[in-house]
Amino acid sequence: MTFRNCVAVDLGASSGRVMLARYERECRSLTLREIHRFNNGLHSQNGYVTWNVDSLESAIRLGLNKVCEEGIRIDSIGIDTWGVDFVLLDQQGQRVGLPVAYRDSRTNGLMAQAQQQLGKRDIYQRSGIQFLPFNTIYQLRALTEQQPELIPHIAHALLIPDYFSYRLTGKMNWEYTNATTTQLVNINSDDWDESLLAWSGANKAWFGRPTHPGNVIGHWICPQGNEIPVVAVASHDTASAVIASPLNGSRAAYLSSGTWSLMGFESQTPFTNDTALAANITNEGGAEGRYRVLKNIMGLWLLQRVLQERQINDLPALIAATQALPACRFIINPNDDRFINPDEMCSEIQAACRETAQPIPESDAELARCIFDSLALLYADVLHELAQLRGEDFSQLHIVGGGCQNTLLNQLCADACGIRVIAGPVEASTLGNIGIQLMTLDELNNVDDFRQVVSTTANLTTFTPNPDSEIAHYVAQIHSTRQTKELCA
């Protein structure tokens, strides 16, 4: 029996994990084992919202060392993380400034400024990327305007997964799928767009040309002295999650559900027409030259903040209490900028309901019900937008990632969208990370080949839409999910 042992480092906005995958070639069997799980979160430092990258690096190394201590031969390592954020380095490879997080307010007003100065349509035609106030282009503009004293010291700008790969190998890389999230990559050339870079204030010399997933960046030397290849996987966690989504046919959509919810479909060509621009659709890079045509939805970030503020530890009990409440009494727009990082999420949700003359969610369960119903309705709205964009309805929706364990939200999504939902795999980003490693090791042919492995080994659950549910009646009552957006705008 031939085995491959691959390690995936998967960092999310709220937690990180080091996972060991064991692939058996003859039976095409893939098993995962968690080696080390650790917390991640936002920190306040010198007036900025930041990431503790030193703590994350220590946790990554701890996890890798644990594998080596077990005497396991590691064939390769891959790292995926969230997008848009970066670390600046000087000529000696030392950090310049702070690793500021995308939820920091330093970019306020800069997106509108860019649209006014460069033209919204021109930016979109160049990048194909949706307008989000924290995109890297606006973060760099904020840095170069607000901290010009740092500029002479900057030699390199590395996105978060590339930074950790650099820390392991000493080699720099700019991986394509994550680079596209910056809104700085030209959609036609797959290279940095000089006009957009110039507006950001960044120097093109800070960046190397983006490379597609599947190349070996360098090697990590383990404590035992072995050199282990570090592979450039699809380093944006959503790109990895999509690779592991067992999409079957052209009418399948995906929803990567976690702190963020990313809903979309795969395409061989980008969508940058006026309809896509009006809907704020993004065309992020995927594996094998595919585009991830999708839209960002605020996701379970709202719930995470409520759990934190109300000090709720028993999530299953909360979901059970939530399920007992009537649907659609409290509806908000989860994508409103007011929910990006408010001082108090509970108060912000209540204020949004008050301002739209709705009942006010007071209890823990009412707040959760508000979030779940609002997300499900927004999912339906976005799915409708995506279907209109491509001119064809979807037949099924694959929900992957940690959020797919929320059976209540899965069923609400199926009911609101009127579509069959297939939930799983939970560790989609990790699996997609492993998939690219196995392709790089010549164990698998391509993404479709890997998806067959996922389909046969992952635990998948199907949710059938119930047209008689409260949320389905709510959607039918307003006749079109497009109106939902207006109701909660």
Swiss-Prot record:
Its cofactor is Mg(2+). Keywords: ATP-binding, Disulfide bond, Kinase, Magnesium, Nucleotide-binding, Rhamnose metabolism, Transferase. ATP binds at A13, S14, S15, G16, R17, T259, Q304, G402. One of its GO terms (biological process) is glycerol metabolic process. Gene3D superfamilies: 3.30.420.40. It catalyses: L-rhamnulose + ATP = L-rhamnulose 1-phosphate + ADP + H(+). Pathway: Carbohydrate degradation; L-rhamnose degradation; glycerone phosphate from L-rhamnose: step 2/3. The active site is at D237 (proton acceptor). It comes from the Bacteria. GO terms for cellular component: cytosol. Monomer. Involved in the catabolism of L-rhamnose (6-deoxy-L-mannose). It could also play a role in the metabolism of some rare sugars such as L-fructose. Catalyzes the transfer of the gamma-phosphate group from ATP to the 1-hydroxyl group of L-rhamnulose to yield L-rhamnulose 1-phosphate. It can also phosphorylate L-fuculose and L-xylulose. This is Rhamnulokinase.
